[in-house]
From Swiss-Prot:
InterPro entries: NADH_UbQ_OxRdtase_su1/FPO, NADH_UbQ_OxRdtase_su1_CS. The gene is ndhA. Its EC number is 7.1.1.-. This is NAD(P)H-quinone oxidoreductase subunit 1, chloroplastic. The lineage of its organism: Eukaryota, Viridiplantae, Streptophyta, Embryophyta, Tracheophyta. NDH shuttles electrons from NAD(P)H:plastoquinone, via FMN and iron-sulfur (Fe-S) centers, to quinones in the photosynthetic chain and possibly in a chloroplast respiratory chain. The immediate electron acceptor for the enzyme in this species is believed to be plastoquinone. Couples the redox reaction to proton translocation, and thus conserves the redox energy in a proton gradient.
C-alpha cells in the first residue's frame, strides 16, 4: 500500500496535535496544584508572623522588626538559615527511618489540603468522602514521627515519638466522631456539600450553633493533633529536650517546623469548613455561589470573595491556639490520656447518638 506525502503530513500533524493536547492537559492539571502549594507556603509564613506578633503582644514586648517591614520576612530568614545548616545523621541510628520520617509527616499533611474548598468550586478534589479522607491521611503523620524517634537511637527522641503516637490515637477518635456528626447533619461527607448545607440561614445556619458540644471537642482534639500547648508533650523541653526532633538539624528539622504550622493551618481551615460556614457570607439568603452567574465581573470576583471570607474566618480562629500557648500550662501524660479517653470520647459518642436520634425523628 502506497501512502503519498500529503497523507503522511496529515498523519504527522494529527499526532503533533494530540501530543500538544496532552501537554496542555498536563499543564492544566499542574497549575492548580502549584497555585495551592504557593498559597499554602504564603499562608504558613503569615501564621508564623502572626504568632510572633500576637505572642509579643500578650507578653508585652516587641516582636520581630528587623527582617523586613514589621518583621514579616523573619520566617523566611529562619527557613534560609536552616536550609544552609549542616544536615547531621546519628552515628548509631537507622539512617533510612531517620530520613524518611520528616517527609512522611509533611506529605501526609499536604495531601489534606486537596479536599479543602477555598471557595465555590475552588477545591482540588471534591470527593464524596472528603472529610474522612482527611482523617485517614492525617493518621499517617504519627507514623512518621514514630519512625523519626526510633531511627534517632536516642531515648528522648524515642519517648517523644511514643508520646506523639499515643496522643494522636487518643484524640483521633473523638475528632472522627465529631466529623461523623457533621456528616449526619449535612447528609454528606463532601466538604463542599457541608458548606452548602450551612449557607441558607447565614450566620445562624453555621454548624457551630447546631453542634456546640462537637465544636468544643473538635477544637480540643485539633489542638492535641497539632501538638500545641497545653498538649505539646511529645516536644516537652524540660523532660525530653526536643522530643523526636532532638537529633535533627538543618532542612530536616525545618520540615518538622513546617509540618507543625501546616497542621495548624489545615485544622483551622477544617474548623471554618465544618463549623463556620466556609466561604459563605454571614447574611441569610445571600450566597457567594450566586455571584458567579451575575455577569463576567462576578465570575472573576466571586472566587476572590469566597477565598477572602474563608481565609478571614480561618485566621480569626487561629487567635485561639496562639493565645492558649501563653495561657494554659502543659498537661501531664496521664492527664492528657484521661482527658481523651475518659471525657472527650464518651461525650463525643453521646453527641453522635443525640445527632443520630434527632435526624431519625426529623424523617
Amino acid at each position: 500500500m502506497i501512502i503519498d506525502t500529503t497523507e503522511l503530513q496529515a498523519i504527522n500533524s494529527f499526532f503533533k496535535l494530540e501530543s500538544l493536547k496532552e501537554v496542555y492537559g498536563i499543564i492544566w492539571i499542574l497549575i492548580p496544584i502549584f497555585t495551592l502549594v504557593l498559597g499554602i507556603t504564603i499562608g504558613v509564613l503569615v501564621i508564623v508572623w502572626l504568632e510572633r506578633e500576637i505572642s509579643a503582644g500578650i507578653q508585652q514586648r516587641i516582636g520581630p522588626e528587623y527582617a523586613g517591614p514589621l518583621g514579616i520576612l523573619q520566617a523566611l530568614a529562619d527557613g534560609t538559615k536552616l536550609l544552609f545548616k549542616e544536615n547531621l545523621l546519628p552515628s548509631r541510628g537507622d539512617a533510612r527511618l531517620f530520613s524518611i520520617g520528616p517527609s512522611i509527616a509533611v506529605i501526609s499533611i499536604l495531601l489534606s489540603y486537596s479536599v479543602i474548598p477555598f471557595g465555590y468550586r475552588l477545591v482540588l478534589a471534591d470527593l464524596t468522602i472528603g472529610v474522612f479522607l482527611w482523617i485517614a491521611i492525617s493518621s499517617i503523620a504519627p507514623i512518621g514521627l514514630l519512625m523519626s524517634g526510633y531511627g534517632s537511637n536516642n531515648k528522648y527522641s524515642f519517648l517523644g515519638g511514643l508520646r506523639a503516637a499515643a496522643q494522636s490515637i487518643s484524640y483521633e477518635i473523638p475528632l472522627t466522631l465529631c466529623v461523623l456528626s457533621i456528616s449526619l447533619l449535612s447528609n454528606s461527607s463532601s466538604t463542599v456539600d457541608i458548606v452548602e448545607a450551612q449557607s441558607k440561614y447565614g450566620f445562624w445556619g453555621w454548624n457551630l450553633w447546631r453542634q456546640p458540644i462537637g465544636f468544643i471537642i473538635f477544637l480540643i482534639s485539633s489542638l492535641a493533633e497539632c501538638e500545641r500547648l497545653p498538649f505539646d508533650l511529645p516536644e516537652a523541653e524540660e523532660e525530653l529536650v526536643a522530643g523526636y526532633q532532638t537529633e535533627y538539624s538543618g532542612i530536616k528539622f525545618g520540615l518538622f517546623y513546617v509540618a507543625s504550622y501546616l497542621n495548624l493551618l489545615v485544622s483551622s481551615l477544617f474548623v471554618t469548613v465544618l463549623y463556620l460556614g466556609g466561604w459563605n457570607l454571614s447574611i441569610p439568603y445571600i450566597f457567594v455561589s450566586e455571584i458567579f452567574d451575575i455577569n463576567k465581573a462576578g465570575k472573576v470576583f466571586g472566587p476572590v470573595i469566597g477565598i477572602f471570607i474563608t481565609l478571614a474566618k480561618t485566621y480569626l480562629f487561629l487567635f485561639i491556639p496562639i493565645a492558649t500557648r501563653w495561657t494554659l500550662p502543659r498537661l501531664r501524660m496521664d492527664q492528657l490520656l484521661n482527658l481523651g479517653w475518659k471525657f472527650l470520647l464518651p461525650i463525643s459518642l453521646g453527641n453522635l447518638l443525640l445527632t443520630t436520634s434527632s435526624q431519625l425523628l426529623s424523617l
